Design a protein with these regions (language model features):
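Soluble or luminal CAZymes and related metallo-dependent hydrolases
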Residues: 1, 39, 81, 160, ...
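Short, low-complexity N-terminal intrinsically disordered segments enriched in polar/charged residues
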Residues: 1-19, 23, 107-178, 182, ...
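Hydrophobic alpha-helical core bundles mediating ligand binding, dimerization, or RNAP-core interactions
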Residues: 2, 21, 44, 70, ...
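A general structural-boundary detector
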Residues: 4, 27-30, 76, 152-155, ...
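A solvent-exposed, acidic/Ser-Thr-rich amphipathic alpha-helical stretch
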Residues: 14-66, 177-231
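A beta-strand edge to alpha-helix "cap/lid" segment located at domain peripheries
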Residues: 45-157, 209-219, 224-284
Length: 284
């Protein structure tokens, strides 16, 4: 499964990955859900046509009980700088049941084409029409009495890992920003959407504060949690609902976070989301 996804981008091998998808298989990308290979192929062809076949710079692969995570850094032939794609995959060793693919479109938009014939210096990805969605408002009376799931509620985790991830989740669900000091190692490495550069945990705090200024009445909610005990690495798919202040509309940002834990502290974190797909979905 992993090699089939890698070969799709590095060899333009559409046949192999198509054979892994059933009609009921879901491939989610750019906030759009494709059912089966016939609907997914246009997504793959658009990427290959716009950016070309890629060279694999690096890959990171982790396994949980039901899900696998694949992180790729690719160097497309038509672009000057590498791009990052992250996948959360569910399969039965024969067929793929679902794939959640997060393309860092902000990194693409900040990229440039290599060919002099191209007049466009900004790489604007060709995006499909997003899935229709209605984001409910936050009920201030119901919210305090509602059960709010934590990572350990939806994934079997070692005790110390559960405590670390639950405390991390409080940063986003409860705005407990003091946990940045207690949950992260002092020299923790952070990679955020829009950049391949490693940053400090201060960049993550600044990201949280920037989101708080852009979105009000926020609510963070878990989708899936996967844990690889061999790598001590967790992958969390989650959403952040909020009112986009500039237009006073409710939006939902889909986020994929990969966390590595060392000695009960977070030593590295990759936080990815599709910025341009969000802008298109809600006309921001």
């Amino acid at each position: 499964m992993i090699n089939a996804i890698i070969d799709l981008y590095t060899k333009a091998d559409i046949k192999t990955i198509s054979s892994k998808l059933l009609r009921s298989s879901r491939w989610q990308q750019h906030h759009f859900t494709a059912m089966g290979s016939l609907q997914a192929q246009p997504l793959w062809l658009d990427f290959l046509a716009q950016y070309g076949v890629s060279e694999l710079i690096s890959k990171t692969h982790s396994k949980g009980q039901e899900l696998e995570t694949l992180q790729l850094i690719l160097q497309p032939k038509k672009l000057l700088k590498p791009v990052r794609l992250s996948f959360v995959i569910k399969h039965n060793n024969t067929f793929i049941k679902s794939v959640k693919c997060v393309v860092d479109t902000l990194l693409l938009a900040n990229n440039e084409f290599t060919g002099e014939a191209s007049n466009n210096t900004l790489v604007i990805p060709k995006l499909p029409k997003s899935d229709p969605i209605m984001v409910c408002d936050l009920d201030n009376q119901l919210h305090p009495t509602t059960f709010h799931a934590t990572p350990s509620d939806i994934c079997e985790l070692p005790t110390q890992t559960a405590e670390t991830l639950n405390n991390w989740w409080q940063i986003w669900q409860l705005n407990n920003l003091a946990n940045f000091e207690s949950v992260y190692a002092k020299n923790a490495d952070v990679i955020l959407a829009g950049s391949n550069e490693t940053q400090s945990k201060d960049a993550l705090l600044n990201c949280h504060l920037a989101l708080s200024q852009t979105l009000s009445r926020c609510y963070a909610q878990l989708e899936t949690v996967q844990f690889d005990s061999a790598l001590n690495q967790a992958t969390i798919c989650w959403t952040l609902d909020g009112t986009f202040n500039a237009k006073n509309i409710r939006v939902r940002q889909q986020i994929l976070t990969v966390i590595t834990i060392t000695n009960t502290l977070i030593s590295s974190e990759v936080m990815q989301f599709d910025t341009l797909a969000l802008n298109q979905q809600f006309a921001l």
